[in-house]
UniProtKB/Swiss-Prot annotation:
One of its GO terms (cellular component) is cytoplasm. It comes from the Eukaryota. Residues 1-22, 40-89, 342-351, 368-383 have a biased composition (Basic and acidic residues). This is NKAP family protein. One of its GO terms (molecular function) is mRNA binding.
Amino acid sequence: MSHRERDRDRDRDSDRDRDRNRYSRSRSRGSRSRSRSRSRSRDRNRNRDYNKDRSSNRDSYYNDRDYKKDRSSNRDRDYYDRDRNRDYKNSSSGSSSGGGGGGSGENYTVKSSSYRESNSNNSKVEIQKQENISKDYFIDNKGVNNSIERKDNIKNENNNNNSFDNRKAEFNNNSYGEKKEFDNNNNRNYHGGNSRYVNNNNNNNNNNYNNNNNKSNYNGTDFFEYRKKLREEATCFSVYERSPSPPKKGELEEIDDQFLSNKKKSKKSRRKSSSNSDSSSSDSDSDSSRSREKRKKSKSRKDKKKRKEKKKHQRKSSKRSSKYSDSDSDSDSSFSDSDYSDSDRSDSEGRSRKKRSKKRSKKRHDHHKESVHDASMWEEKVEQQTQTLSNRDIGPKPISEVQVGSYGGAMMPGEAEAIAQFVKENKRIPRRGEVGLTSEQIASFEETGYVMSGSRHRRMNAVRIRKESQVYSAEEQKALAMLNREEKAKRENRLLADFRDLINTKLQAD
């Protein structure tokens, strides 16, 4: 049993099990599941046919692959036999042609090497040459000289080919050496005048590794000192600033002395500030005092605002209490006049009286102003005559109910109302693709011959006509209903007027 048959049987078994499970599930369900099972069975049959075609294609692929394998295995054997026979034939034909030449004295033989060992192109060329030689030799008796010339040409061609092959082999053999020489020349040109420096570096490195010494041949100095001298002697300036050099011993001592003197001065200033509290403080103290003064000023401003507000409230309260205080003060003054005589009053009492009289006059003047102001503020308003509740509506007006479905069915929500707005304004209803244009522009386009729907959109055009006719019919029905209502109202009004006239005539007659 081959692998192809095994794969085919496995696929068939898996399909059968899957079909059996699906069939058992579909039987357990109701009528709705049966319809589903039918569609599934259709899909299953389709997949089965697809798998069959796939399996047949797979078999053809496997057959082709096996055929190619067998062919490739036998190809080498066939090529070997063919080449061997070809070499044998060429060798035999070359020897016979050489013997037939006679006069030339040269035998053109082919090497008895296998086809794999010799170059295929060279062998083909040699075979063609041998065939040409035999043809030229056996044309006629006069063709002997021609055949000899042809042989000479063939010799020259062989020599040229051999010389070219030899040159190519020499180039391949010598390519590595030539490349090496080229690299060496480049290195020489690159170093140029710096060869002395390079040699010195190499020598110095060798000395360092051999002797294990840190010093080199930089004029008896270290490498770092030598580089430092080069930097100092250099005329070019660096873009970046040099890092500051560390201070020397004398400079360090001067810095320490300055630091100690500053410390002593700060101690003396502290003592002076403690003894003389009124003396000016340092810059930092002055800054802090300024900030404190600013804070105090802001606080004082806030306090002033609060005091002003309190004074306003007190003035209002004093104005209200002045009504009662004036009457009390009048009674006190009358009592004092009766008790004391004019002769017993001293100058001090006279002065105090003058002050009191001035205060009273001011208070009365203020009270008069307030009374005038209060009279203008507290005028009695006349009550307006309230309308009867029966004549006016109370509360918000009810929202007008939109009759849903009055335009017919098969319409998008809000679509019929939008179309109805255009109908009320006696405008053309815009179609699909006409949103950016006005109704006048669309009408002008249609008059010139442009049609927005076209022959491909007949169904869409039919839907549009149906919707528009629904809206038109609904609007016409509404208009008819309004006319009927108006006519009905007119009739009722006429009847009422006739009844009133009859009643009035009867009353006048009585």
